[in-house]
């Protein structure tokens, strides 16, 4: 079972990593910003921690799978992400924000189970995607920012 320090480290790392992604969304005035991304990741991290805790307590009494709760989180995030997507004038806005919410949920789950390298690398890749690929799209495809 995890000690208090491990639990705190996992929650704080979840906050920091998702905060970086949420800050980018906030700076660009998207529908879901800093607080939403942090809360979503923290909730996902807590759910994973709770799943691991339950598994540790009852592993000898019943067949349990900690991944089942995580799968429920990912399904639930789909509904939350759908709320960030707006159909407007024949176009769709908010897809990138919806995807970033899904990614921070995954980061929260990864930090919750101690999969730090994956969480860190995913955060780096997400930030590269959000910051730099925006400019690549403009240069290569003449695509203007549509998601507001």
Where are these regions (language model features)?
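Loop-to-transmembrane alpha-helix initiation sites
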Residues: 10, 68-69, 114-125
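Small-residue-rich segments of transmembrane alpha-helices in multi-pass membrane proteins
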Residues: 39-49, 72-75, 99-112
